[in-house]
């Protein structure tokens, strides 16, 4: 299941803002870039609710897997975790999150991937 529209990041200005103004958290399998939300950037995308809600994007390089099926499977796993855990915990946090997966073969190890993802969420203080 994909992220709801009000939780998605989109547009090159948004990603440029995150790359310039983010705090980076590194793990073995992925890196997090967390930045304070800036709703003015989203106004150019005609968002009716350009609020300070938590938003996220997951970027998976072809270096992780050449097959789009595997990359989409990983993306769906992480998005499902976000959908089930973030609204319950704190959807009011005004942060934007960009998740970049590092090079490696971990398509078959869902538990290791989710454990690393959850550890970085705690480390970045997006969840408590």
From Swiss-Prot:
Q: Which InterPro entries did the record assign? A: Ribosomal_Su5_D2-typ_SF (IPR020568), Ribsml_uS5_D2-typ_fold_subgr (IPR014721), RNase_P (IPR000100)
Cite the entry's keywords alphabetically. Answer: Endonuclease, Hydrolase, Nuclease, RNA-binding, tRNA processing
Listed under GO cellular component are: ribonuclease P complex
> Which enzyme class, named as a word?
hydrolase
Enzymatic reactions: Endonucleolytic cleavage of RNA, removing 5'-extranucleotides from tRNA precursor
Q: What is its EC number?
A: 3.1.26.5
Write down the superkingdom of origin.
Bacteria
Instruction: For this entry, list what GO says about its biological process.
Output: tRNA 5'-leader removal
Q: Where is the signal peptide?
A: none
Q: Give GO terms: molecular function aspect only.
A: 3'-tRNA processing endoribonuclease activity; ribonuclease P activity; tRNA binding
Q: Which family does it belong to?
A: Belongs to the RnpA family.
Q: What does this protein do?
A: RNaseP catalyzes the removal of the 5'-leader sequence from pre-tRNA to produce the mature 5'-terminus. It can also cleave other RNA substrates such as 4.5S RNA. The protein component plays an auxiliary but essential role in vivo by binding to the 5'-leader sequence and broadening the substrate specificity of the ribozyme.
Task: Give the quaternary structure.
Answer: Consists of a catalytic RNA component (M1 or rnpB) and a protein subunit.
Protein name, per record: Ribonuclease P protein component
Which organism is this protein's natural source?
A: Prochlorococcus marinus (strain MIT 9312)
Lineage of this protein's species? Bacteria, Bacillati, Cyanobacteriota, Cyanophyceae, Synechococcales
């Amino acid at each position: 299941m994909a992220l709801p529209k009000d939780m998605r990041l989109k547009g090159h200005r948004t990603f440029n803002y995150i790359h310039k103004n983010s705090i980076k958290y590194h793990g073995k399998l992925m890196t997090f870039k967390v930045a304070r939300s800036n709703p003015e950037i989203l106004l150019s995308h005609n968002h009716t609710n350009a609020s300070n809600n938590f938003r996220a994007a997951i970027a998976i390089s072809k270096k992780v897997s050449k097959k789009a099926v595997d990359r989409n499977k990983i993306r769906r796993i992480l998005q499902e975790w976000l959908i089930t855990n973030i609204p319950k915990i704190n959807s009011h946090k005004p942060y934007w999150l960009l998740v970049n997966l590092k090079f490696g073969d971990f398509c078959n190890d869902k538990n290791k991937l989710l454990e690393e993802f959850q550890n970085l969420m705690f480390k970045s203080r997006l969840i408590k």
